[in-house]
Structures are given as C-alpha cells and as structure tokens.
Curated annotation (Swiss-Prot):
Organism: Saccharomyces cerevisiae (strain ATCC 204508 / S288c)
Residue ranges, compositional bias (Basic and acidic residues): 502-518, 715-735
Region (Disordered): 490-535, 550-572, 587-764
Function: Functions in the late secretory pathway. Required for the generation of secretory vesicles as well as for actin polarization and polarized growth.
Record-linked InterPro entries: ABL9/DENND6_dom, DENND11/AVL9_GEFs, Tripartite_DENN
Keywords tagged on the record: Cytoplasm, Phosphoprotein
UniProt record, GO biological process: post-Golgi vesicle-mediated transport
Residues of the cDENN domain: 195-360
GO CC annotation terms, alphabetical: cellular bud neck; cellular bud tip; cytoplasm
Name of the protein described by the UniProt record: Late secretory pathway protein AVL9
Record carries keyword Magnesium: no
Amino acid sequence: MDEHEEAVIFGICLVDFHHKRGPEIEYWYGLPEGTQSAELWPNLPFQALPDGSHSFEETFTYFTLLYDERRQRSPPNGATDLSDDSINDNTTLFAISCSRQIKSDELVTKDKDVTRSTVQKAIVVISRQPIFGQIKDKLSIVTNAFFLQHDFGDRKIIQSLYENLKSIYTPASLVRNAENRLYIGLCLRKILHDFKRNALVLLKAIMLEKKIIVYGNDVEALCNLQFGLISLIPDLMSNLQDSGSPQLFQDISKLNVVDSFKSSNRESVLRFLGFPLPIFEKGGLFSPYTPLQQMNDIRSERTLFFMIGSSNTLLAEQKEELCHIFVNTDNSTVDILDKTLNPVLQLSSHDKKWIESISGIVSDTWNENDDETPKNSQFEGSEDFIRWQFEDYLTGLLSSVKLSDYLDLHKENDQALKTIPEDMLNSNPVHLFNLNWVQSWKETQNFLIFNSRTDDRLFDLFPPKHIYNGADTLSLLQQRFLATFHNLKRSSSNSSSNKNGHQSEEDIKDQESIESKKSVSQISVNPGKNTDKPAANLWNSWKEYFNKPKNTANEDVTESTEDLKNRSKTSNAIQKAMMGLGLHYKPDAETDQQSEEVGNSEDNEDDDTDEDSEDDDDDGGDDDDSEDDDDDDDGEGDENGDDGEGDENGDDGEGDENGDKEDSQDFSNGFTDVTNINTDHDKENEQNFEGNAENFNEDETVADKDIEGGPESNKNSDSKTDIYENDRNVEDSSKTRNTVKKSNEEGGANDAAIGNCVQDEEKL
C-alpha cells in the first residue's frame, strides 16, 4: 500500500458506453491493493465519455477525482459532503481519458449487449500529478491500437501501458525539473492567440476567486484553457491537492514567514515570493470537466467559488444563476455576467498595453502547422517566453502590493519611510494594476495566505513595478497640460508687462534681432542712402496694413492704424484719380514736408525688360499705398496690386461718393510725381522716396522697398508741381485710357471728374 501511495500512476481503467445502462467502468488495472473498485468514483464514466464526444474521432478529457487515502475509496456523497474526520484523509487525483469509436460490424467478436451500429470506449489514466501532456501521446497510440485489434476482449495492451507509465514516472523522476514537466502539452500560445487580452482578465478573475464556467464543444480545448491559465501562476500545478473539494484547505496558523531564500534554488525563491498563490483552498472547487451528475457539488453552499468546464448545453443555459463569468471556447469570448465585476476586472492602461504586446508577438509568429512552436523556432513568442512574462508580471504585482501596504502601515513613521528609496516612495506602482482589482484581491483567501507567509519588505529584493515599461498616456497628457499652462502663463505675463510699458528680456532681444536684420537689409538694398534713422514704427504700421483682411460687407479694406485714418480725404481722392492716368498729384501746402509711398505691383508684365525706376512708380502708383480711410477706400487698387486695375468692386481709380465730389473740385492744385500719404507717424520720420533705378532691385516690388528701407525725405523737391514724362508706349497709354473708361462706366458718379482728367492729360 505504501508503494502505491508513493507511485505517481495511480491506476488505469477502461470505460464503455453501454447501450442500455449508459457509461460504466468495464475494467480496472493497477489499483492499490485493498481498494474497493466498486465504490470508486461513480461519476468517472461520465467524465471519461463527455457529452458530444461521439462527434469526434478522438477526444481527450482532463478531470479531477477525490480520493480517501485511509479508507481507499472515493467520498460516498460527493466532493461537498465530507465528514469532519475524513477531510484530512482526502486528496485530489488527476485523470486523462482518450475516447474513440468503431463500427460494430468491424468487431471480430461482438458482445450480445452491442445493439447499436457503433461502439464507444475510453481508456483512462489516473495519476497523482497533472502530467497530462507527458502521457497524452502514449495514451493516444495505445487507444488507437486497442481499437485496431477489433477485439475488446484482449486488454494486454492496456496493462502494458500501465507498466510502462509506472516505470517512467516515479516520485524521484518528477522531482527533477518537476515544474517544467507539468507544462508539457499546455499550449499558452493557443490561449493568447484566441483570447488575447481576455487571457489576463481570466487570470485576474481566478485570483479573485470567482465562479467561472468554461463551455465548448471541444472538450480538450476547454480543459487545456483551464490548466493553461492555472499554470501561469508559478508552481501552482504542483500544488492542487486541495482543489478537488471546497472542504479541503491548509491550516494557515501553522505557516511560518519565509524570510530567506537561496538564489540558486528556484523553489526557494518562489517560496520567498509567496508562490504558489493558494487559489483553490477552502470554499474553492476545480473541476476541468464537470458532467451534469456533479451539479450538486456546484450548487452546494460550501462551494463559494469554482472553475469548471462543460460541454453540456443545459449547463450553459443556466449560466446566469450559476456563475459570475462565462467563457465560450467555441468563439473565444468572455462574458462577465456579474456587472459589479466590470470596474474590478477592467484592465489598466499598462495591463492592456502589456498583454496586447504579448498577444501581438504570438500573432506575428503564429505557425499554422504547429500551435506550440513559433515561426523559425525563435524564443520570442514561445511557451517559455510567455510563461516568464507572466511570472515577471505577477512578481511585480506582489512586490507592489507589499510596498503599498507597508507605506499605509508606516505612513506616520518617518524613520521607517526613510529606509525606502525616494524613487520607490514617489512611484508606488500599485495603481498600475487597477486599484479596484487590488482592493478586491486583498479580500480573498489566497491573499491572506500569501500575506501571512511572506516578508513585509519583499520589495527590498524584488522591485515593485509593472512589467510594461512604456510611457503612460495619462502621464504624457498631464505633462503636456502643464507645459501648455506654463506657456499661457508666460504669455499672459508678457502681455501685461507690455501694457504697462515694460518689455521682457526675451522681447527686447527679439526686437534687437529684428532691428539688426532690418539694418542689414537696408544697407544691402540702398547702399548709397543714409540708413541711420530707424523706421521700426513705420514698418509695424505698414505690416499691420498689409496683413489686414478684406471687409466684403463694407466693400473696403479695414485699416487698424490711426496714422492711416487721419489722412486728408480730398488729397487722396485726387491722388487716386491722377494715378489712374499715370500722373501724380502734390498739394501746395505740403511741398516742404512730404512722404512718398509707392504701392506694390504684383502684375507687372514688363518685369523682363530693364525699366527705370520711373516706370516702376507708374506701375505701382495706384496700389495699396493709395488707400483711403474707412469711408474713402473705394479708390484703392485690389489686394493683389494689379497695375491700374481695380478689384471686383470697381475700386480702380475711383473714389467713393464724397471722394468724387472732392475730385472735381481740387484739380487746380496741380500735379506731382509722387503719391502723398500724410500720417502723424510719417511727419516724425519724414523721408523722401524718389526714384533712382540703381537704388532698387528689379526683382522686388516698390512696396517691399518701402517696408525695408522706409521713406526718405526729398531734399531736391523745390518746384510746386512736377510732371513725370510718360515713357510708356502708345499701347500702355491706350491701356490707361481704357482702364479709366472702364472705371467711369462702373462708378457712374465720377464721369465728369475723370473726363476732365483725360482732357488735361491730352493738353499736356
């Protein structure tokens, strides 16, 4: 008996589906001596031949069995009705079955009970450890060979299987690299490929000790999912002895705090970290495949939480009243039925990015021919890679929770807080795992056991962190918000200082830089002129003017500077009319002090030839520089500065209604060669800008030169009126007359005034 208790392989049996009695155990082999086989696991046949297994050529099923070591039998009333004196005698065993079917006509010897066209049987191997992956292939081969005999009376092959497995899997052999042996056949890549981020949701739900049902037609897939999720918690697969009944648990009062470990011993390190987390302790049940015959165990008041699997649709129809979370492996969905769990199981941003990166790697390396092996057999995306990633995630989680609890416990103890590094104090990364989930986890039984057997300063040796090292989106947004706030604050401060007549150092530097660039520009454009007088104010005034948008509602251009608003309406009206003819007007009263402005001409068709500066003046004379104030802007050129042509409102050479009257009254004042624009600012910086062709670049418009160089005083202007000779050819003169006539037709009210101007030109 002692020999069998130590044996890893507990026994093997053959299950038959009887056409009248249903599933039943047909044959046992290898049971410990004295075991009452007739009273062993009445539900085992239903677990070995699951619902829907007849739809598959071959079906594997994983399930748990409860066994009383002292009495050598299974509990008589199920897993939830153990007597108090037998609780400590019970343990959990693990079984894997392989079922197949054959046509009854193919059998060499047909039993008289065979009344249907097919015969279905299953071979079941029971062990003390969940070594399903290691024995699955052998079990499949033996089962197939057993059916190929076409004679179920010959059971020697089943006996050979037991002897072979017993000799291979001994307690000593499992001790060596025991953890990795249990992971064989559990395809984590398949889980992440199908469920992606929900794989992490399910793992965190298991740690919260919730009721979870896994449903699907493919029994092997739903069993693989459950064991795969459990295997993500380090060393848990080796410690499932209490998972078969909600009445089994370990006494935490006997646990001692693990305060040291040996770094060369992995098991020692895991014990120091608190692994494995005892998930299925008192009140918990783990049954990878659960037939309807075990519904009493599920509904029992002693069953507080569970993870079970089923392929029966009746159980799926009752999911609302049976579980908190329902998982469907057929379509890879996770349905959280208890809506109060939504905020708890919501993944944090770090959780999402990490699990999505892992599932993305799996998808990128997916191999259609082999679920367990990535493309090119690389490590990234492999089973070990995934398992280590989850181990690092859980290690960081446990350490972060320990740090958070320590800070809460010693928040008023400065001496204790000084022993913690400042960066660790400031980070406190527990919030990266979703604080709602952390708070719920602290209320579970497995956390209480973990907390009672681990050191309070676990974070000193294992850094508290989230495995995802990417930038936090929320932190980036906060940084951007703060930067924007500081910029707005500085802008507000600068505006306020400017209103008070003060300038910041940055503004002073910027202004000095602009003036220095302006001086260089003036020297390069006008090397022979005097550039000592600054024209910054005039530049600012004209810069605003050129940047002003067109006011289509009032059919004028809005001007912002007071200098432009104070100009004489009469002189401007006359100037516009004269410039339409290619002539320039100069009032008597302003002979000594005058400012010359020439507008920008963008439409000059004669730029290819070498024209003198007088031609440039003629072309640009009726541009933007001849604008009137808000009420008298109709005489200006369009915004593009076309030569002598107005915009769509007919502004070329025309004044408004008041301007036209003044045009007809003031022709006697004479003609001049420049356009007169008088502003208060111009009087302070009075300069004459009379043209010498060498002072201007032919590639620049006249308005640009005014902006950079500013007007200069005309010291040589002695005569009251000067008339430029019109060097344009006959075609240009004709063009000018046509322009004037067009303006007369559009304006209407200015016919008389413009007519007089034409006559004066002909006389000249």
